[in-house]
């Protein structure tokens, strides 16, 4: 399923295999299609044929609400529904549920919350999350967990960790049962456990030690990039990494900037996802190999250059900065689509170049050159 083929320090070059799409080269960035589509008018066809995407990520909570996981199941699963034949990871819905802080009630069984669409009450626990993700037929299901608020009181974070551990045990049991059913959508679906513990290193380490005893197919670090300083995020990764099984993939959830990804790889992380490339693109903020630019700025009005002269994405091969700026100022939907395509391609190319640097034994030099540069504004 997962094999580390080369290392440089803690950075790992690996190959991940799952039911759909054959081999995935890691480190990898997963493109976020929350409701089985990338916001900004980007389809699975774009991901596959134009953007170099390896894995797509969809949202359990949103797909449960609409069209309904039962609808997706009747359509043959998420792969057939959205016409994507590569790997799909579905998150458990926990992050979205727990972000509805004023609308939810937590118990040992799970969480009762109000739909953000129409306010009707919904219950979701470990078993419900596993059943929804089984209906979706994703390649990787994420365990149901609680993502605590930042900052969180120590005692609450500790109790939450303990409950999330018990929930993982229930997830594992239900996941195994569902995979064994004769009519399951994807009998090869994998399960990743999630490390929690807020910003408390001792809780993080304890929790990682406990969930590592449960035989999951991979392990994620969750509950970061929720308002804590970047340095604290890196400290938590450094604290947890030694306790993560070396033979399983490691996933840093919801992170992040290009610099975050480079620094995450340097700390032993294999999988990343973030809404940032698509979200920033929809506001005209574009990533380049010299830093980020705001295409709405007046200085690009007569600029004949592509977004990034170093980029060979479909957008940079065809269109100028001046044209992109015009589309945004005219509020044409095409501007958003082209911007999203460029940013997703950039993120996919970033992880490709990280892999190449690991293959060639020069990741440290790549990190030195780009970790700070990509955070600059131009």
Predicted regions and their residues:
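Non-catalytic, usually N-terminal nucleic-acid engagement modules in DNA/RNA processing proteins
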Residues: 1-185, 298-301
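Glycine-rich phosphate/ribose-binding loops and adjacent secondary-structure elements
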Residues: 162-165, 174, 178, 186-307
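Glycine- and acidic
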Residues: 150-153, 158, 218-224, 333-336
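Structural signal for hydrophobic packing residues in well-ordered secondary-structure cores
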Residues: 137, 168, 172-175, 179, ...
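Short secondary-structure capping/turn micro-motifs that flank functional sites
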Residues: 64, 149-150, 227-228, 280-281, ...
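A non-catalytic, amphipathic alpha-helix used as a structural packing/dimerization or gating element
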Residues: 128, 132, 136, 159-170, ...
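C-terminal extensions of enzymes
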Residues: 1-17, 24-33, 40-41, 145-151, ...
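Conserved, mostly hydrophobic/aromatic
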Residues: 22, 56, 91, 133, ...
């Amino acid at each position: 399923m997962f094999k580390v083929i080369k290392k440089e320090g803690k950075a790992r070059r690996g190959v991940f295999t799952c039911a759909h799409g054959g081999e995935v080269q890691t480190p990898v960035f997963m493109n976020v299609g929350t409701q089985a589509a990338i916001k900004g008018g980007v389809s699975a066809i774009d991901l596959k044929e134009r953007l170099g995407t390896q894995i797509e990520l969809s949202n359990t909570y949103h797909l449960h609400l609409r069209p309904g996981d039962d609808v997706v199941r009747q359509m043959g699963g998420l792969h057939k529904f959205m016409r994507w034949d590569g790997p799909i990871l579905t998150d458990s819905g926990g992050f979205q549920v727990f972000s509805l802080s004023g609308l939810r009630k937590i118990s040992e069984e799970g969480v009762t919350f109000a739909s953000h669409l129409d306010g009707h009450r919904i219950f979701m626990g470990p078993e419900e999350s596993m059943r929804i993700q089984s209906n979706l037929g994703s390649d990787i299901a994420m365990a149901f967990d609680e993502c605590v608020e930042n900052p969180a009181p120590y005692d609450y974070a500790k109790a939450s960790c303990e409950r999330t551990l018990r929930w993982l045990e229930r997830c594992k049991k239900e996941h195994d049962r569902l995979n064994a059913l004769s009519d399951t959508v994807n009998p090869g679906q994998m399960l990743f456990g999630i490390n929690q513990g807020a910003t408390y290193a001792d809780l993080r380490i304890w929790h990682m030690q406990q969930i590592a005893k449960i035989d999951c197919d991979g392990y994620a670090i969750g509950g970061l990039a929720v308002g804590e300083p970047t340095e604290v995020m890196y400290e938590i990764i450094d604290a947890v990494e030694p306790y993560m099984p070396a033979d399983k993939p490691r996933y840093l959830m919801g992170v992040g900037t290009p610099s975050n990804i480079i620094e995450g790889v340097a700390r032993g992380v294999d999988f990343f996802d973030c809404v940032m490339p698509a979200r920033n693109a929809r506001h005209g903020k574009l990533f380049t190999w010299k830093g980020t630019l705001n295409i709405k700025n007046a200085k690009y009005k007569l600029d004949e250059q592509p977004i990034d002269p170093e980029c060979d994405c479909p957008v940079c091969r065809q269109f100028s900065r001046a044209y992109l700026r015009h589309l945004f100022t005219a509020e044409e939907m095409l501007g958003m689509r082209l911007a999203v395509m460029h940013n997703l391609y950039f993120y996919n190319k970033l992880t490709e170049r990280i892999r190449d640097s690991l293959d060639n034994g020069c990741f440290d030099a790549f990190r030195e050159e780009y970790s700070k540069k990509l955070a600059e504004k131009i």
